[in-house]
Amino acid sequence: QLTLLPIAPLMHGATQWSILGQSLVGNRTILIPKFEPHEVWRLVESEKANSIMITGDAMGKPLVEALDDPGADYDLSSLLAVTSSAALFSAPVKDEFFRHLPNIVIVDAIGSSESGNNGMATITKGDTAMKSGPTVSVLGGPVVFDEDLKPVAPGSGTIGKIARTGNIPVGYYNDPVKSAEVFITVDGKRYSMPGDFATIEADGTITLLGRGSVSINSGGEKIFPEEVESAVRSHPAVLDAIVVGAPDERWGQRVAAIIQPRGEVAPSLDEIQEYCRDHIAGYKVPRQLHVVELIERSPSGKPDYRWANNIVAEVPEASDSGGARTASDS
C-alpha cells in the first residue's frame, strides 16, 4: 500500500483526481490543512509518504528552500515521487529537488478541468534541460489542431491548440457562448479545446507552450508567459515572478516582469535582461520590471494574471510607487 500526500487544496481538480485514483486502488491518502513547507516534510517523514503532489514552482520552490534551512534534517527515504500539475514546474526547481532527493522520480502532468489528463512526463535526475514547457507523452485522445482545425504534423514545429476527444463534458453550465468556443465538433467528432497552445515533436510527444488567453503579442510574435517566467524565476535573486504584456506604441505589447526578490535588494532590469538572454530568445526578454513584496497567486498556486495586469496598469512607465518599483527600457 502506497501513501500519497496531496498538497494543493481540495478545490483543485488535480488533487481531487489524485485522491480518487488512490482510493480506487486501495492506497492511503494524507491531507494537510494548510501548505507550510516544513510541515509537509514532517508529514512525509512521520507518515512515510511515498508521493507528494504539488502545483509547480509556487509550492516546489518553498519546499526545496525549506530543506536548506538550518536544522532541516528529515528522513525522506520513503519518498519515491513528486508529481506536479496546473502550474509551471521549472527546470531549476526540479534540479533542486534532485539535489536533495537524487533517487526520486518527478512526474509533470498537463490537463484541464475541461479535458482531464492530457499527458505526463516522467523525469529523473539529469533530464531537466530548460524547454518552453513540459514535453509529455500523450495518454490517448489529445491532438493538436492548427488555426484551420487540421491536425498538426509531428515534427513540423507548427504551433496549435491541444484538443481532446472521448469522455469530455457536455459544456459549461448556463454558458452556451463559452461552451460553443471550447467544445467543438471536427469531422463529426466532439473535442474539448480550452486554449492550451502546444507543438507536436517528431516522436509524437506534445510540448506545452501555454494558455492563449494570457499570451503576449509583441510585433506579431506570440510570447507565452510561462517560458519567460521560468527564466526569470531561475535568477538567483528572484523568489517568484509573473510575466504579462504591457502596452507598447511600437510593438503593440512588450514583456513586463513582476518579481518578488529573494532578499532585500532586488535585481535591476539590466541584470534580469542580461540573465534572461542566456535562456530565452531576445524578443522574449522582459522590457519592463516591477518589484513587489509578494506575488499573488490563487489558492491552488496558479499565477493571478488579473492582479499582475493591474500592477502593470497602475505603473505603466518608469517610476517609483512605493510598494511596486518599475523600470522600463523602450
Regions found by a protein language model. Give the residues of each.
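AMP-binding/adenylate-forming catalytic core of the ANL superfamily
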Residues: 52, 111, 160, 165-166, ...
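Short hydrophobic/charged patches on amphipathic alpha-helices used for structural packing
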Residues: 38-41, 71, 229
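Short Gly/Pro-enriched turn/cap motifs at secondary-structure boundaries
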Residues: 130-137, 182, 188-189
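Conserved AMP-binding/adenylation subdomain of ANL enzymes
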Residues: 1-3, 11-53, 66
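Helix N-cap/beta->alpha junction signal
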Residues: 33, 56, 86, 165-166, ...
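Acidic/polar alpha-helix N-cap and adjacent early helical turns
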Residues: 309-330
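Active-site phosphate/pyrophosphate- and oxyanion-stabilizing loops and adjacent acidic/basic residues
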Residues: 61, 95-96, 230, 274
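Gly/Ser/Thr-rich phosphate-binding loop
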Residues: 24-25, 49-55, 64-130, 137-143, ...
